[in-house]
Each structure stands twice: as C-alpha cells, then as structure tokens.
Curated annotation (Swiss-Prot):
GO terms for biological process: aspartyl-tRNA aminoacylation. It comes from Deinococcus radiodurans (strain ATCC 13939 / DSM 20539 / JCM 16871 / CCUG 27074 / LMG 4051 / NBRC 15346 / NCIMB 9279 / VKM B-1422 / R1). Its EC number is 6.1.1.12. ATP binds at residues 218-220, 227, 473, 525-528. Homodimer. Belongs to the class-II aminoacyl-tRNA synthetase family. Type 1 subfamily. L-aspartate binds at residues 172, 218, 438, 480. It is found in: Cytoplasm. This is Aspartate--tRNA(Asp) ligase.
Length: 577
C-alpha cells in the first residue's frame, strides 16, 4: 500500500495534471463503451475515476464493486467542458494503477438512498450508514463545535474537570440507571443524570470556573430529541449573579455559531419571563421564529351568552389562516391531547363570524375583530378553562399550525432567547404537595426568600433560566443556593425531612457548611443543539452510535441478557414479569 498524496476533498485547481494517489471506498461503478467509471469516496469528498481498456489498471479495476476499498493512482485533470458540474465534479482521475485493498459484501441498503431506508435498518448497520456524506458532515460539525466550545471556555478561564460516572442515586426527576456493586452486595451505584452536585462541589473547592462535556444517563421515555445516554455541555461559575452567567453564555453560543456555521447571532438575546412565555405562546420554550401570540379575551366573554366561556377563569384566542373543517378537526384533536376539553372556533365573514360558536358572539364581534386583527376568511381558535391548561393546549395548537402552514419559514433560521423567572415551586396535584420546578438547589430571587413556609410560597420566583432556540430548550441553569439555611428551607418546602435530606445529600450539605461562594451555572443539551445547527430531524442524526426510540442499540444488540453467573456475582436475581 502506498501513501496517499491527499484526501479527495483537498484536490483542486492546484493539483491539475499532477499524479495523485487516493484511497477510499467505491461509491458507484459504471461500464460505458469499454471504459470503467468509478466514484471514489473518502470522508472529505468524492471524485470520478476513469479507467481505460488499454490501461494496466483495467484488470484490477474490473474487480471493484460497491463499497470495495481501493487505492487509485492516476492523473488529476479537468473533465470535458460539457460534463462539468462545479467543484470536484469539474475534475476526474485517469487511473494508471488500481489496487483492491479489500472486498466488501453487497450492502443491505443503497448508501446514496439512506434517508429513504427504514431507520432501524440504518441503525442496525450503523457503520455503513456513517459512510454517507450527510452523516459524516453531521459528525464533523459536532467535532468543530467541540473545538469552538473548548477554545472559548479555555480563553475565558474555565477549567475542564471530569466528574464521576459511578455515583450515588439521588432524586433528580428521571429514573436512574443503576449499577450493582460486586464488592458491596445489595448496594448500587447510579449513572449520573447530570454532574449537578459535583460541579457545585468544585465551586466550593475553589475552582472558580468549570466546564465539561459530560455524559449523562436518564431512564425516561424517549422521543426525537432524547436518548438514554446523552451529552451535556456543563458549566459553573463562582462569584456571579444571573446576568453574569447569561452574558458569558450569549458570547459562547455566538462564538460557536460563528466558527462552525459562519452565522452571526444578534446579541444580546431577548428575555421573556416564564409567565409571559406561557401566557402569550403556551410554552416555556416558545418558537419565536414566528409571532402568533395569543390574545386574552376573558373579560370580553365574562357573563356573556356562551356559558362555557362566561365563567371560565381564562379564555385565550389564537388567530389562524382560513382553515378547512378537516384541519379544524385535526387541531381540535391536538388540543384534546394536550388537556383541553375541545377547541372552539370562528371564521370571519365580513364584519361578523360564521361557523363554530358564531351564534354566541354576535354582540361582541366588532371587539373580537379589533382585538385579534383577524383577516377576512381567517379563523379564531379558542381555549378556555384553568389558565395553565388553556394556554398549554393552545400552545400545542400554535405549533401544529406552524407545521401545517410552515409559519417559521418567514422568520430567521435561528431564533435564540432566554426564558427567566420560573416559579421556584409548583404544586403537584397527584401528591397534593409542593415540589421543585428545576431542582432543589436552585436559588429563589433574594426578595422572595421570606415567602418560604407562607401561603404565598407558590409565588416565589427562581433565579432559573432556560436557553431556547426554535422552540427547543437547548440549555437550562440557575443561580444556586449557597446559604445552608436557605437550602434547609427549600427542602422543608418540598416535604424533605432533615433525615431524608441527610440520607440523600448528606455529603453535599456538609460541604455547604465550609464556606460556599455565590455561584451559578448552566448545562446545554449538546446533542439537541447540534440537531438544530445541522438541520437534522432527530438527535440520532448527530450521534455516532445512538439508541432507537425504544432505547435499543440495534447494532450491538443492547440491552441483552447476561449469564446467570454474572448476575450471581453482583447479587442480582431477575424476576419474571
């Protein structure tokens, strides 16, 4: 085997009429008029190779089939004018020597039709799927993003520290993946859902600024933007307030987009309170590439003819284009799936309305038209009831309309914003108790600390913030509690006894007593961010070896049974269903 002269994608005008040696995979072979035409591919690009019948390379080239590994030596030259398509397609290699480096079985699917192949087949043969240029571009984009993150944070004085992968099971929201300890029978480690406590301990230890591309594990239901094992870009800073954290994050994200995509994100990012996001868009991660904010018409219907709205705590309306009855029925299905009892509607006709609940709104039609600005033929969609249920359901309808009419197409490619001032606590109807909205180490606004233990503790605002892009939460963080007394009040508010808190978090509570600095941080969902940056439809497209939506690795066939002897060693017995 000879040493290659370059990657295929490095060839260009400067290499014209030079002898080159290339190595890669045969994407395609064509036989035409006695000539053999090959497309040779490596990670950087594809080039056409022509083998003439009188060439000493012909016999060896005749052995080549799809996905064979080959070494080609020949002259790099322009293709005939009529065959040029721009870039590398303007050139070809006239082969003088061909060597088959390895044969290949016929692939189970055509690589150039990969996106039309069932995903389970692609995942089973992931090593072949990853040969596709689209997949290689996605993973190279990921590598560039890691480099951009590292160079920025290193320059800003952050220190990269690795935290444990085997740790203690603590309540963090999702189920833990548990690992039995062979040396301590009956006891278990947990794989980390996040490095939350360890990064706070690093601030207590005096490291001032920390970051890590952390592997995290959560045993939860999966969807397009979730995996059981995933990557967070985790960061923490000492002696900071909320604005300090947000300012660094804005510059970091702008740097990543500039270096990786050559896209300038406008700074600073707009901020919106949790209440405003929910009240106007029905989501704590609103897609702001398009507006379509709700209008509150509670007062307009109060005491009116339509009983369902007359006494409703909240009535919200969303303006939509003209809709067919079939489309309205589909949107009503979306609303019901998200907690609404139904989806009332009206269609504007002149200075009034037809359809839906039109017989109940004759007297308020002018006010509805004025307040909503609905166009002729346009549709009004209503949700009514308890505030959070109403706005959440209408928020789901808003996103369905976005997809139906491609409403985001008219906005920026990327819209980034902050959602701030989340509630510190939320009331769980099932358990009839208060619980944390983010995690129990989130600090409340200083002016709200006095509300702990009072009837108004549900009004407390957290110093928590989410970074939102195109309707996805790509990061979330908070200023942390650094005062042991405030931490005790937080545990008390969520029903954690002192004994329970000690059992779960004793090591951390001890550390808080040894001079904890004010600190705050954030974690990015790195896979989710890369999904958005690359335009992929799923985070599985930006992860080299992902699980499917059932949490299975179809290539490695994991999870899988293990030997009884292995289970016995760690004291585990599998029960039947």
């Amino acid at each position: 085997m000879m040493k290659r002269t370059s990657l295929i994608g490095q060839l260009g005008q400067a290499q014209q009429q030079q002898t080159v040696t290339l190595q890669g995979w045969v994407s395609r072979r064509r036989d035409l008029g006695g000539l053999i035409f090959l497309e040779l591919r490596d990670r950087s690009g594809t080039v056409q190779v022509q083998v003439e019948p009188d060439s000493p390379a012909f016999a060896e080239a005749d052995r080549l089939r799809a996905e064979y590994v080959a070494e080609i030596e020949g002259t790099f030259q322009p293709r005939p004018e009529s065959q040029r398509k721009g870039g590398l397609a303007d050139f070809e290699v006239i082969a003088s020597r061909v060597k088959v480096l390895n044969a290949a079985k016929t692939p189970p699917f055509e690589l150039d039709k990969g996106e039309s192949v069932a995903e389970d087949i692609r995942l089973k043969y992931r090593y072949l799927d990853l040969r596709r240029p689209e997949m290689q571009r996605a993973l190279m984009l990921r590598s560039k993003a890691v480099t951009a993150v590292t160079e920025f944070l290193d320059a800003e004085g952050f220190i990269q520290v690795e935290t444990p992968m085997l740790t203690k099971s603590t309540p963090e929201g999702a189920r833990d993946f548990l690992v039995p300890s062979r040396l301590n029978p009956g006891e278990f480690y947990a794989l980390p859902q996040s490095p939350q406590l360890f990064k706070q301990l690093l601030m207590i230890a005096g490291f001032d600024r920390y970051y890590q591309l952390a592997r995290c594990f959560r045993d939860e239901d999966l969807r397009a933007d979730r995996q059981p094992d995933f990557t967070q870009l985790d960061m923490e800073m000492s002696f900071v307030e909320q604005d300090d954290v947000l300012e660094v994050q804005e510059r970091l994200l702008a740097h990543v987009f500039r270096r990786v995509l050559d896209v300038e994100l406008p700074l600073p990012f707009p901020r919106m309170s949790y209440f405003d996001a929910m009240d106007r868009y029905g989501s704590d991660k609103p897609d702001l590439r398009f507006d379509s904010a709700f209008t509150d018409v509670t007062g307009l219907f109060r005491g009116g003819e339509f009983a369902a709205f007359a006494s409703a705590p909240s009535v919200k309306v969303l303006v939509a284009p003209e809709l067919t009855r079939k489309q309205i029925d589909e949107l009503e299905r979306v609303a019901k799936q998200n907690g609404a009892g139904g989806l009332a509607w009206l269609r504007r006709d002149g200075e009034g309305f037809t359809g839906g609940i039109s017989k109940f709104v004759g007297g308020i039609a002018p006010q509805l038209i004025e307040q909503t600005g609905v166009a002729q033929g346009g549709t009004l969609l209503f949700a009514a009831g308890e505030w959070k249920k109403a706005v959440t359901a209408l928020g789901a309808v808003r996103l369905a309309l976005r997809d139906l009419f491609d409403l985001a197409a008219g906005g920026p490619q990327f819209h980034v914003s902050w959602v701030v001032d989340f509630p510190q606590l939320e009331f769980d109807e099932d358990s009839q108790s208060w619980t944390y909205m983010h995690h129990p180490f989130t600090a409340p606004h200083p002016g709200d600390v006095a509300l702990f233990g009072t009837e108004r503790q549900g009004e407390m605002r957290a110093q928590a913030y989410d970074l939102v892009m195109n309707g996805f939460e790509i990061g979330g963080g908070s200023v942390r509690i650094h005062d042991p007394e405030v931490q005790a009040k937080m545990f008390q508010a969520i029903g954690f006894s002192e004994e329970a808190a000690r059992e779960k978090f004793g090591f951390f509570l001890d550390a808080l007593e040894y001079g904890t600095p004010p600190h705050g941080g954030i974690a990015w969902g790195f896979d989710r961010l890369l999904m958005l940056m690359s335009g992929a439809g799923s985070i599985r497209e930006v992860i080299a070896f992902p699980k499917n939506n059932r949490g299975a690795d179809l290539m490695a066939q994991a999870p899988s049974p293990v030997e009884d002897a292995q289970l016995a060693e760690v004291g585990v017995q599998v029960r039947g269903e």
